[in-house]
Amino acid sequence: MGSKIVVNNYGSFDVKMAYGQGSTCYDVDGKKYIDFLAGIAVNSLGHNFKPLVDAISAQAARQIHVCNYFLSDVGVEFAEKLLKATGFSSVYFGNSGAEGNEAAFKLARKYGYLNGGEKRRTIYTLESSFHGRTLATLTATGQEKFHPACFAPYAEHFKTIKPNDWKAIKT
């Protein structure tokens, strides 16, 4: 059905989805499914949500993507709205959660280096956490099942701790 030609991060079900409406998905045979996963938590508005479809269509008719060497009018407008809502002074746009986490790791490492040098470069993460599928985000993920030997060596200076284990941070 395709599961032999499409490489997947997870074991796939032998179901080929065709379309969705709201929280309901339909496979190629018309069988109905309730999407409790919400596309692994990225489809919070559901499938085929008309205001979102219209906004994406309108933007795609103007321009699909602007290389990050340039600014875009809608990007700046959105950044201004985010900054006003949060009170922050700048915003980073990425393409995925893993990319956002990678940027956060770099910012944390830079801050640590500028405020303590080599001794302040450890990044602490929590047991049972998940941070993404890049090598650094896998390293940060606090679940051994995501650390197979075939992906080694993993990034250095990550430490997984139990929630609220303040002693582990101080040592």
Regions found by a protein language model. Name each.
Residues 80-171:
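PLP-dependent aspartate aminotransferase-fold enzymes
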Residues 1-21, 38, 161-162:
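Active-site-adjacent loop/helix segments that line or gate small-molecule/cofactor pockets in enzymes
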Residues 17, 48, 74, 161-164:
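Short secondary-structure boundary/capping elements
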Residues 6, 13, 33, 41, ...:
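Glycine-rich, flexible loop/turn motifs
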Residues 32-118:
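Glycine-rich loop-to-alpha-helix module at the N-terminal edge of alpha/beta enzyme cores
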Residues 27-28:
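Short, acidic, Ser/Thr-enriched surface-loop or helix-capping motifs
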Residues 1-3, 53, 57, 152, ...:
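Generic detector of well-ordered alpha-helical segments enriched in charged/polar residues
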